Amino acid sequence: MSLPPLVEPASELTVDEVRRYSRHLIIPDVGMDGQKRLKNAKVLCVGAGGLGSPALMYLAAAGVGTLGIVEFDEVDESNLQRQIIHSQSDIGRSKAESARDSVKGINPYVNVILHEERLEADNVMDIFSQYDLIVDGTDNFATRYLVNDACVLLNKPYVWGSIYRFDGQASVFWSEHGPCYRCLYPEPPPPGMVPSCAEGGVLGVLCASIGSIQVNEAIKLLAGIGEPLVGRLMIYDALEMQYRQVKVRKDPNCAVCGDNPTVTELIDYEAFCGVVSEEAQEAAAGSTITPKQLKEWIDDGENIDIIDVREINEYEIVSIPGARLIPKNEFLMGSALENLPQDKKIVLHCKTGVRSAEVLAVLKSAGFADAVHVGGGVIGWVNQIEPDKPVY
């Protein structure tokens, strides 16, 4: 369905702007009016990472007048494989500042506003209220539900994207005209069930594919052209090079945008998404050791069995000496339990400690009462014990 333009047009374009945007201006559906609307638009991008990088660059190139960036992280070398708004010289810098500099380099006429803070329930309403449209470039479920609920409560549209390995998804959520994210995903998946990009990986160029689609949808909404992806989920398979669409209907029983909503104010989203399950938290309490403690046990010849619960491709990048690989899913399915020694202390680890805590809960319930896991995982080990090893 077509929707009216989201913003009013700016009063005029300068001679330099006409020259810059001339290839837009000669498109009948965009023209002078559409470009003026882009100039007058205020768009917020949540995140300057894999999706935020191409989104910000193309929004800037398109002539969106004001771009807000919510980002609190710093540029890491592992980001550069996909986060093309940053460069080698930006490693260690604020992502927000790095993104701002790239945006200004692409288009000096864009006004950039930085929000160098973590997006949370106590600041999201104030930040979002300053913008016409939100572009969601987040990679965790807690923030996705936060973005969705804030947009519903503020009646703001937002363009959503998701990436994992070779697969991508995109849609436009606007509860006034169609479904919201909760209509599609009423409940978050169990903690640890869906790996993040840091755990499962992502093809770098996939970020550009989905990020560009997000910008395309943003331009359509701002200028009031075409049919935005409201009520439609676009699914992209990069390996098969296939696009398909699934219709998504507004759920009358949706907790936030339904006929009788139960979520009428923002909640604790990390608790809602169970960033670490209660079982894992309980299991880890009193059963977490540091990388330095593990190093002491190894040096002292303690009778331990170090088990890495990551995936094999992660194990091949970097591992703790003496650790053997048993992926998390083998524990969740129960197949790994029978092969565990009864006469050794089990020491679990993963990348950062989240997955190993989940496995620890499984072992505790199976009777391995003295099992422990390494807080901080292999990343903590590298940082504290073997800093010359690679991280990812």
Predicted regions and their residues:
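A short, aliphatic-rich alpha-helical micro-motif
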Residues: 38, 127-132, 340-341
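E1/E1-like adenylate-forming module used to activate ubiquitin-like modifiers
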Residues: 2-6, 107-121, 125-213, 223, ...
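Oxidoreductase and adenylate-handling cofactor-binding alpha/beta cores
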Residues: 212-230
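Glycine-rich phosphate-binding loop and adjoining beta1-alpha1-beta2 segment
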Residues: 4-12, 69-107
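Conserved N-terminal Rossmann-fold NAD(P)-binding element of oxidoreductases
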Residues: 46-47, 70, 349
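N-terminal charged helix/coil linker that caps or initiates catalytic domains
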Residues: 1-44, 77-78, 266-268, 272-282
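Rhodanese-like catalytic fold shared by cysteine-dependent sulfurtransferases
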Residues: 3-5, 101, 238-252, 256-304, ...
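Hydrophobic/small residue at the entry helix of a nucleotide-binding pocket
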Residues: 51-52, 355
